[in-house]
Every structure is written in C-alpha cells, then in structure tokens.
C-alpha cells in the first residue's frame, strides 16, 4: 500500500508539473512576443527621432545630408571620396518594400579617444536616405550621384549547387536551430538518466524537488524543441532566399554584388575603385565547381571587402579577366 501511495503521489506531481510547465511555456512565449513588439516600437521611435527632418542635397561636387530632431547631425562628402552605393533592406524593410540608401566613403583612421558614435558613422558611411521605397532608388541616385547612373543590369546568379550548399551551411553547420536541438537532446538524455536514478532509488528527491524537476523537464524539452524548429525553418527560408536572390554583375564601368535572404544588401562600386580582387575556394567548393568572389575598396577606415559565396567557376574566371588591366574594353 505504501509503494502504491508513493507511486500515486509521484504521478500526481508529474501531472501537476506538466500542467504548470504548459502554463509557464505559454506565459514565456507571450512575454517574448510582447517584448519583441515593444523593442520594435522603441527602435522605430528611435529611428524617427534620430533621422527626423532628414535632408539630402547635391552642391557642386559635394553631397550633404543633415538630420536629427534632438541632436542635429551634418555630414558632407566630396564625390571623389565616394567608393560605393549600398542598398540595405532589413527584414521589416523588405516586408514594407523600403530600403536604406547609403554611400561607402573613405575615412581616416579614428583615434582611441573618438566617440562610439563617430566610429559607427565611419563604418556605415553616409546615409543619403534612411527609409525610401525601392522603386525610388534610381531617381535618388540620379539626383545625388549621377556618376553611378550606369550600373550593370545583367546579373549573374550564384551556381545552381549553391542552394544545396546554402541550406547545409545555414541550417546545419552554422544553424542555430539545429545546434539548439542538439543541446536540448543532450539535456533530455541527462534528465532521463536522473529520472531513472530517482525511480531506482539511486537519487533521493523529495516531492518539491521532483515537482521542480518535472517542470524543468517539460520547459526545456517542449520549449527548446519548439524554438529549435522555428529557428531551423527560418534558417532554411533564409538559405533559399539567399540562393535565389544573390548575384553579381559588371559592365565596362561598374560592379554590383547582391546578397539576399531575409535581409538583403546590394553594393555597387566603380571598377576603378577596386583596390584588390580575387577568388578563393575550399576543397568542397572545388568539388562543386564554385568560387568565392572578393572585391576590396577603400571604403571605411581600413578598406571594405565585398564577398559573394558560390559563384560558378566559369563566371568567376570571366570576372577575373574583367579585373585585369584593359579587361573592360
């Protein structure tokens, strides 16, 4: 009778722990959603205050911008120092059809006593529009930097095998969801061992400890696997979008590199601004017939390298020929 009573108590505690875990998981999930929404609202409000009253103009050979409601900021740059045009779309901007338009520029090295804000401005270049419709980008470039009006149009997509490689790279090798599932599985094994020891009497736990153990078990297993599944799906979607949208293009004057995904960035720069260009490949890429393109300009305080992974080997070799002196003729 005593063993039966103890078993009944243990079963009741496990059931109560399961119910408490379900409520706890629901509360935590709701809290995370609310927190994300609140952070997004504060981020949008901060951007509005930071870029309120934004103005951009072209004055002879200089591009000037000014913005800020609480702290007014003025930036100017000579057109000769402009190294690239950068179109950035965060996930939210992509959903809305908007982008951030900026210019990569040459910056002097910053000293140790420079402020963090100055370093950030140097790294991101000069923003010529913080929030603009994608279909207005050509119009703005024609008005502010007409020197960049002859951008290449015929894009060369990444190799077909890049989709498979991107899915493996982003969802497995560097996938947050996959490795979170591995960690949860290890925790599950540990909890299973502890539970087995408790059942055989190897580890003695009172009713309160057993209750807490049951809650922890359910939270980690259910919540961990659920989060891992969501992250895994996000990684796969990001990889598929990257493979579909990533490309590079060049003509007699310019090169353009696009890296897609849930967020997207397109960088365009003149051929004469490329200080160094090369291709590289690892053994897996050589087996797949792909190369990584790297083009370095003087943008920023120490130069900026734009990279595209898994271009086809034939396209990469043609691009190297274009980089050679006279290769754009």
Residues of each region from the PLM?
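N-terminal basic, Ser/Thr-rich segments that initiate or prime the first beta/alpha elements at protein or domain
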Residues: 1-329
């Amino acid at each position: 009778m005593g063993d039966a009573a103890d078993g009944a108590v243990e079963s009741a505690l496990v059931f109560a722990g399961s119910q408490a875990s379900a409520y706890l998981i629901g509360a935590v999930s709701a809290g995370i959603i609310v927190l994300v929404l609140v952070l997004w609202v504060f981020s949008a409000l901060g951007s509005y205050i930071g870029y309120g009253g934004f103005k951009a103009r072209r004055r002879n050979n200089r591009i000037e911008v000014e913005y800020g409601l609480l702290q007014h900021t003025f930036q100017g740059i000579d057109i000769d120092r402009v190294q690239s045009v950068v179109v950035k779309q965060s996930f939210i901007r992509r959903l809305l059809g908007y982008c951030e338009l900026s210019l990569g520029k040459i910056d002097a090295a910053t000293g140790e006593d420079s402020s963090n804000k100055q370093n950030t401005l140097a790294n991101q270049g000069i923003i010529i529009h913080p929030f603009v419709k994608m279909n207005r980008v050509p119009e703005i470039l024609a008005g502010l930097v007409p020197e960049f009006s002859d951008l290449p149009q015929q894009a060369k997509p990444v190799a077909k095998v890049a989709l498979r490689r991107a899915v493996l790279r982003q969802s497995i090798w560097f996938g947050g969801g996959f490795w979170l599932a591995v960690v949860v599985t290890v925790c599950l094994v540990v909890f299973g061992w502890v539970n087995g020891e408790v059942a055989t009497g190897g580890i003695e736990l009172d009713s309160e400890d057993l209750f807490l153990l049951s809650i922890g078990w359910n939270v980690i297993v259910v919540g961990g696997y659920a989060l891992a599944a969501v992250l895994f799906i996000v990684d796969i979607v990001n990889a598929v979008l990257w493979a579909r949208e990533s490309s590079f293009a060049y003509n007699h004057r310019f090169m353009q590199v696009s890296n897609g995904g849930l967020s997207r960035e397109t960088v365009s720069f003149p051929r004469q601004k490329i200080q160094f260009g090369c291709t590289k490949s690892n053994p897996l890429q050589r087996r797949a017939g792909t190369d990584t393109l790297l083009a370095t300009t003087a943008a920023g305080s120490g130069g900026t390298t734009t990279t595209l992974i898994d271009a086809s080997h034939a396209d990469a070799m043609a691009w190297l020929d274009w980089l050679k002196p006279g290769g754009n003729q």
